Amino acid sequence: MTAQTSAVSVISAANRLVAKVGSSLVTNEGRGLDRAAVGHWAAQIAALHQQGKQVVLVSSGAIAEGMARLGWRKRPSAMHELQAAAAVGQMGLCQAYEAAFAEFGLRTAQILLTHEDLADRHRYLNARSTLFALLRLGVVPIVNENDTVVTDEIRFGDNDTLGALVTNLIEADALIILTDQRGLYEADPRRDPAARFVAHAQAGDAALEAMAGGAGSGVGTGGMLTKILAAKRAAHSGAHTVIASGRERNVLTRLAQGECIGTELRAVLPVWSARKQWLADHLRLRGRVVLDDGAVHALLHEGKSLLPIGVAEVQGEFERGDVVACVDMHGRECARGLINYSSADTRRILRQPSSQIARILGSMTDPELMHRDNLVVT
């Protein structure tokens, strides 16, 4: 792990921020919303607005509020009951934030997203345009996953990931992940009192992922590993990440003033174009193509397109234009991108030179399976 030192938080220079607030920071230990806590976050974000900063808030808490409104003491396991609780609770969550921000003369907007919204290029661009319009109008967007319609197979899984995707979507300067932990430790501090705190590191450092466990409260679903991976995602759009305790007094305003709180993960990874960022942010891939060593080298080190001659195997079913993963012979993903041929056609032309595509398929739409402009090395 490569550590860095910094006297001033990276948040102080950020003009556009995404702040993610976990369930435990807006609920009464999972039993409905904590209105005082909601007001506390609204006050801090209002202060950031006064400084000219644009803020998007990614907030959990809908299911916990729904359970309280429905009188449920135990979190249900059935998907349809969780979705019902989310639908009921989202009303309360929006009402609470609307009332809290109104105290400071600010309007709020509800944005509910699913993975399908961000996987579809047109819907992705529409969501992006809407968020930009809201920010220009001085509105505070409140973002959450659309739990009512999402399925297990296409869930973001946690709001840490959603926060990173929104960060990339709006090209934010920084992502702040607020949790019930101080930040990142080299081991779980609840099990190892001698665990050392990590104040500064580089987003995407493999050593961070290796040492991260599933630290987190019983209310939320996001452990430290999801936060580290979220920081890695955000870094590819140039955004720095801070993982800090939401229990710290006025944590957002103090970060904005330059105080170093929590773990700061600086963005040092190559910044991808908006299109390549969209490709990289796909959480659900339609299939995989297994590449030989020569093809892997061509993608990773020569910036080449993927040709059918370098494909050893096709896994899964997909159509032309789907996002497909490229993996090496050991199953490790090395790239992903838009495929030019269906899985059925790819199986027919794998291991063949591009000059044979028309003969085998009857016509050739593209000489490449994936053009280098439509793939991203991961």
UniProtKB/Swiss-Prot annotation:
Q: Where does substrate bind?
A: S60, D147, N159
Gene Ontology biological process terms, A to Z? L-proline biosynthetic process
Q: Has UniProt tagged this entry with the keyword Membrane?
A: no
State which pathway it belongs to: Amino-acid biosynthesis; L-proline biosynthesis; L-glutamate 5-semialdehyde from L-glutamate: step 1/2
Q: Which reaction does it catalyse?
A: L-glutamate + ATP = L-glutamyl 5-phosphate + ADP
Keyword Oxidoreductase appears in the UniProt entry: no
What Gene3D superfamilies does the entry give? Acetylglutamate kinase-like, PUA domain
Positions bound to ATP: K20, T179, D180, T221, G222, G223, M224, L225, T226, K227
Specify one Pfam family.
Answer: AA_kinase
Principal localization reads cytoplasm
Q: Which top-level group of life is the source organism from?
A: Bacteria
The record's listing under InterPro entries reads:
AceGlu_kinase-like_sf, Asp/Glu/Uridylate_kinase, G5K_ProB, Glu/AcGlu_kinase, Glu_5kinase, Glu_5kinase/COase_Synthase, Glutamate_5-kinase_CS, PUA
Task: Tell me which residues make up the PUA domain.
Answer: 286-364
Q: Which UniProt keywords apply?
A: Amino-acid biosynthesis, ATP-binding, Cytoplasm, Kinase, Nucleotide-binding, Proline biosynthesis, Transferase
Q: So what EC number does this one have? A: 2.7.2.11
In the UniProt record, which is one GO cellular component term? cytosol
State the Gene Ontology terms under molecular function.
ATP binding; glutamate 5-kinase activity; RNA binding
Compartment(s) where it occurs, according to its Swiss-Prot or TrEMBL record: Cytoplasm
Q: Spell out the HAMAP family in the cross-references.
A: ProB
Q: Which family does it belong to?
A: Belongs to the glutamate 5-kinase family.
Function, in words: Catalyzes the transfer of a phosphate group to glutamate to form L-glutamate 5-phosphate.
Q: What is this protein called?
A: Glutamate 5-kinase
Q: Which organism is it from?
A: Bordetella pertussis (strain Tohama I / ATCC BAA-589 / NCTC 13251)
Q: Which gene encodes it?
A: proB
